[in-house]
Amino acid sequence: SIRNPQLYPLKPCKGTASMTLGCLVKDYFPNPVTVTWYSDSLNMSTVNFPALGSELKVTTSQVTSWGKSAKNFTCHVTHPPSFNESRTILVRPVNITEPTLELLHSSCDPNAFHSTIQLYCFIYGHILNDVSVSWLMDDREITDTLAQTVLIKEEGKLASTCSKLNITEQQWMSESTFTCKVTSQGVDYLAHTRRCPDHEPRGVITYLIPPSPLDLYQNGAPKLTCLVVDLESEKNVNVTWNQEKKTSVSASQWYTKHHNNATTSITSILPVVAKDWIEGYGYQCIVDHPDFPKPIVRSITKTPGQRSAPEVYVFPPPEEESEDKRTLTCLIQNFFPEDISVQWLGDGKLISNSQHSTTTPLKSNGSNQGFFIFSRLEVAKTLWTQRKQFTCQVIHEALQKPRKLEKTISTSLGNTSLRPS
């Protein structure tokens, strides 16, 4: 009967200028097996040995490599009728020069209007002209913000390099882990950092919320919201605002809310000029109290990075839905930044927010750095069967003016139609 092989990658314990690797293929029947080596190295030679054994077979394949950089070698084995597996071996030269990494960041308590944190990755003692740097956030490569990488020193055949990356305060305060990934001589080196321990009053949390695209581009009344939660009371709490163009600005609205868990929250709303926000001017919300060791400062500006317009898809109700309601779903994906507004219309008229709900933006998987959301609308079965038209309206800054995109669905249309508004 057919028996598939077992694979064992073989590697010497000690590195030399040239290195011989092996791939042991054993306990298979019948002959033959095919062994193929793959590598990014041009300096390699291979030898395949004949199979041994009267019943279960065993064979070996060898590859010899030489060079100054680390490389991956993959042994790929096939055995009829369907066996198809690989094993990969990393080869590091004996005389590899390992650089030293140092990852630094700017203040953990940034009070500047442009709420960015600077990450600096210093790479000391690498081979000249043999270094590449990439940045990761929670193990995912950052592609929407460009890093600045410069050579800072040459010492014979060695050099030192610095890479600088700007991230938003929101990214930093999310407690994500940021990684500087350096590749030199084919080997990866990593340095990690994350935000400093909390320096603010325990329990009191402050959020600074940007203008919604709906208010910014359609209603013409953009506003910033500063939300302070988990206060004992509003007594002696002082909330002030600063704007980059002015020393201070006055909020137009202030709300206090008492909660069942005996805490108090404060909401301060600041109207902003749309042109100032779009041009990137910064704002600060400062929360102070006599018992605080220091004021809580939150800064915000328009999110930096390459813009990406959303893709919009509307799905009809599922056929299995049997009650008097019908559920329409709108998928909005691959947009950046994450600020987005979604509304639903019925025959061109705005539908109440109580009839639909929208998820918070979620990060897309894979290499795409965009976001996606779902919006769900419930309508009466009679309205759907009467061939009413329902529209998912999306407002986002990366769309063409007037920054709106609509997708309409109806039983009378037969399918959906997409149009900019």
Curated annotation (Swiss-Prot):
GO BP of this protein: B cell differentiation
Alphabetically ordered keywords of this record: Cell membrane, Disulfide bond, Glycoprotein, Immunoglobulin domain, Membrane, Secreted
Protein's cellular compartments: Secreted; Cell membrane
Role this protein plays: Constant region of immunoglobulin heavy chains. Immunoglobulins, also known as antibodies, are membrane-bound or secreted glycoproteins produced by B lymphocytes. In the recognition phase of humoral immunity, the membrane-bound immunoglobulins serve as receptors which, upon binding of a specific antigen, trigger the clonal expansion and differentiation of B lymphocytes into immunoglobulins-secreting plasma cells. Secreted immunoglobulins mediate the effector phase of humoral immunity, which results in the elimination of bound antigens.
Subunit structure: The basic structural unit consists of two identical heavy chains and two identical light chains; disulfide-linked. N-terminal variable regions of the heavy and light chains form the antigen binding sites, whereas the C-terminal constant regions of the heavy chains interact with immune receptors to mediate effector functions.
Leader peptide range in chain numbering: none
GO cellular component term of the entry, any: extracellular region
InterPro entries the UniProt entry points to: Ig-like_dom (IPR007110), Ig-like_dom_sf (IPR036179), Ig-like_fold (IPR013783), Ig/MHC_CS (IPR003006), Ig_C1-set (IPR003597), Immune_Resp_Modulators (IPR050380), Immunoglobulin_dom (IPR013151)
Organism: Mus musculus (Mouse)
Protein name: Immunoglobulin heavy constant epsilon
Intrachain S-S bonds: C23-C75, C121-C180, C226-C285, C330-C392
Glycosylation sites: N43, N72, N84, N95, N166, N238, N261, N365, N415
Location of the Ig-like domain: 5-97, 99-184, 201-301, 310-410
